[in-house]
């Protein structure tokens, strides 16, 4: 039997008035009916104990709950229950109304009160001789002795089980926060109320219970210093314990004050368990003493030997009794040890202020309403489970936010480095190389040069006065359909508009036969610049600069060379690169095809070095290249570039004349050429003429001597909208600005 009492007689008598208790705690009482339930063993059940009236201190079981909850709670409950008739409204949820008459209270004055003094002193760090009258409690009836039994058993069980369950002291209950408020007024008004103990109502409530809980920790340091004084008074007052209940009751209150403050301070600091190691008298050491006293009382059957000698009681802190001295050696410490412990606790109070409330259970939320909001209060309000869940969520969000901020700062740093040193990236880029080093002035100079021309023989030269008119008419008319490409150029245009000979129209190249197979358009290697359109799965259409005599055949769509016989793009890069820096023309004539069918496949390309932006641009350019009858593919050419065309009859030369100031900016769909400048007297781009007999134009090639540079100019509007990367766009813009300034 644990914490149940001193002997078997008490157990038998107690079983008569009490119901079954928890079997583990009270095996002999398990079969008996009636009485409250067993004390809880966890914190949730402990909280339930404080909210259910039937779970209040009743027998050893209820007292054990107090011991598991906190030592201060049990001590204060016992002491104040003794003073206020055992059932105060301070324990409103837990009171079991008592019907004890004045006779039972009078019994308590002489014997039970003295035991209560000893139990209170024991909880405050002093030796106790509590078990003196254990038998007397069991001898009475339940109606007479129920309050006293609850008080006594609460003290004994809290002392007997405290060492075994000392790990639960870190979770004090609401009483550890409430009772210091009452303790602050005990010195003033409680002792006056303690004298007429018999007249007190069992349900009288102390007025100081509802005071601000901030006094819980303010009076700890003051009361700790008075512990020794009150202990000396209480020990000295044991001499007069037989004189009357009034004087002993005052001692009870003094002891209650000191003992509760000591135990409250123990719960106010988490360092209470360290005190036994430091050599100071600690509350946790006292259960050993009381257990030894219980055993001694049970064996000897008398407790007078521990209480009667007053001299031993006065010197008990310095020299304990032999029976107790054998059990616990910590009691040999002087009284200054407890004061030293109080000094250390006061020194640690400022550091552990936040940790004090952390040890409170969920039932103590009402005691901290007047304090400032702190995480510990939130724990008490929403519970530890919800608090830690919310805390984990907040920490995760902060971690994600920190990672995002880190990435943002890294991106900003990279952008600043790119903006500060673009030349480093340009030098390390093999694709760029020197592609962006040519200036606009150089580009303009190259554009001023005439395009390659196809010169016909003198026999084909006919009156050229009709060329402007024909050019104008062809420019204003809508472009013919694809099926009218070759026949219209050879037949319809000559019959209806020109009126020239229909049988002598054919192209006769002036170039020698050994140059027939050479390209009519030749590029100058050192000055060619190309922006290769590449489709990227992530960025879409991207331009990659390329510097060389000609665009790479494998990675670029062929540029268009207008006003020229459609040329076939070589299938391999080797043929392309070995064709004297030009676009090779197949040896056989390129037939335009029958009407109604496309005369130019996708691998054909006409005029003025415009890279294909996308397949749509290629289709539009091919559509324009299907009309070899000159400006018909560009019906609105005059509108864009103010270009006038002079077309020659079968014996003449078809020429393009453009003003020097006219330029057509390259774009993906509107204009298929970059910057076209043709002089009236300069060489003209090669253009085939159709024969009247077969109406099949033959490709003709110009001379290399008449060919000049064709440079791919980087369009500014496209370079600004390219989306390959911000660094590449920035580098291009910076280089162009530097070139403009120079």
UniProtKB/Swiss-Prot annotation:
The keyword Nucleus applies. Residues 232-243 have a biased composition (Basic and acidic residues). Disulfide bonds: none annotated. The keyword DNA damage does not apply. Residues 211-222, 294-306, 314-330, 501-523, 688-724 have a biased composition (Polar residues). GO terms for cellular component: nucleus. It is found in: Nucleus. A motif (Nuclear localization signal) lies at residues 344-349. Induction: Circadian-regulation. Expression increases after midnight, peaks just at dawn and gradually decreases during the daytime. Its main location: nucleus. Residues 1-23, 115-163, 186-248, 280-337, 451-523, 665-726 are annotated as: Disordered. GO terms for biological process: flower development; regulation of photoperiodism, flowering. Keywords: Flowering, Nucleus, Transcription, Transcription regulation. Involved in the regulation of flowering time. This is ELF3-like protein 2. The lineage of its organism: Eukaryota, Viridiplantae, Streptophyta, Embryophyta, Tracheophyta. The gene is ELF3-2.
